[in-house]
């Protein structure tokens, strides 16, 4: 039995992960190494979050008992998709996972920033929460440092927890050479050539806040380095 054969046009020998990644709307996901999935340490705590956990894991690994009762097949398939997403969030923080997502980033698989002044900057998927069923996935632009809703509804409906809140920032920590200069350009509303005062005041407040945040982060980084030096 193959629970996913009804939506797949390929032959019966197709692996579940290949089938899942081939579904429209799943282009943001990368392939999680089977060794990572089989290491139960990497799955710690997930059994409490996923119904039919054992059967779902077996389905992902293509070792599911073919005699699974028909009345639970749909539930197991849905749980397998959810489980893969949660595993994916952990995997893309590993060296192998970061590299695979880096390759997709280089190919602009996640799209370009819609902000005109970012000049087509490639984006990265990010979650606004690490808790499943809370927020859908967003796209993070490293140039303007803002997040956007994916254009496609297929992508916009993906759970943000499948990518997590740390992924894009971890990627640039591991690959600092990919860091892009932050956008300093800002559209300024004008009427007959004069800046609109209310917007100018807002921009000034934003700049002050941004500078305070930058100093706070620099201070925290320096403190962290001092602690490491002492130890």
Curated annotation (Swiss-Prot):
SUPFAM superfamilies: Casein kinase II beta subunit (SSF57798). Phosphorylated by alpha subunit. GO terms for biological process: negative regulation of transcription by RNA polymerase II; positive regulation of pericentric heterochromatin formation; positive regulation of silent mating-type cassette heterochromatin formation; protein phosphorylation; regulation of transcription by RNA polymerase III; signal transduction. Regulatory subunit of casein kinase II/CK2. As part of the kinase complex regulates the basal catalytic activity of the alpha subunit a constitutively active serine/threonine-protein kinase that phosphorylates a large number of substrates containing acidic residues C-terminal to the phosphorylated serine or threonine. The gene is ckb1. It comes from the Eukaryota. The keyword Phosphoprotein applies. Keywords: Phosphoprotein. Disulfide bonds: none annotated. Gene3D superfamilies: 2.20.25.20, protein kinase ck2 holoenzyme, chain C, domain 1 (1.10.1820.10). Belongs to the casein kinase 2 subunit beta family. GO terms for cellular component: cytoplasm; mitotic spindle pole body; nucleus; protein kinase CK2 complex; UTP-C complex. This is Casein kinase II subunit beta. Tetramer composed of two alpha chains, one beta chain and one beta' chain. GO terms for molecular function: protein kinase regulator activity; protein serine/threonine kinase activator activity. SMART domains: CK_II_beta. Transmembrane segments: none annotated. InterPro entries: Casein_kin_II_reg-sub_N, Casein_kinase_II_beta-like, Casein_kinase_II_reg-sub.
């Amino acid at each position: 039995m193959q629970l996913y054969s009804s939506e797949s046009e390929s032959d019966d020998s197709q692996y579940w992960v290949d089938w899942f990644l081939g579904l429209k709307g799943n282009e943001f996901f990368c392939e999680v190494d089977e060794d990572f999935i089989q290491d139960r340490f990497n799955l710690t705590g997930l059994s409490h979050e996923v119904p039919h956990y054992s059967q779902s894991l077996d389905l992902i690994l293509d070792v599911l008992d073919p005699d699974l009762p028909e009345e639970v097949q749909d539930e197991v398939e849905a749980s397998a998709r959810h489980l893969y997403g949660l595993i994916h969030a952990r995997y893309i923080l590993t060296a192998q996972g970061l590299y695979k997502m880096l390759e997709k980033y280089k190919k602009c698989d996640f799209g370009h920033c819609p902000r005109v002044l970012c000049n087509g900057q490639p984006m990265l998927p990010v979650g606004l929460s690490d808790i499943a069923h809370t927020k859908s996935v967003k796209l993070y632009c490293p140039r303007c440092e803002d997040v956007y809703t994916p254009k496609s509804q297929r992508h916009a409906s993906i759970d943000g927890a499948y990518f997590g809140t740390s992924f894009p920032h971890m990627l640039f920590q591991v690959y600092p050479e990919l860091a892009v200069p932050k956008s300093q350009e800002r559209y300024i509303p004008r009427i007959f050539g004069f800046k609109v005062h209310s917007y100018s005041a807002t921009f000034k407040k934003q700049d002050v806040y941004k500078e305070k945040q930058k100093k706070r982060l620099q201070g925290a980084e320096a403190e962290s380095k001092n602690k490491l030096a002492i130890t």
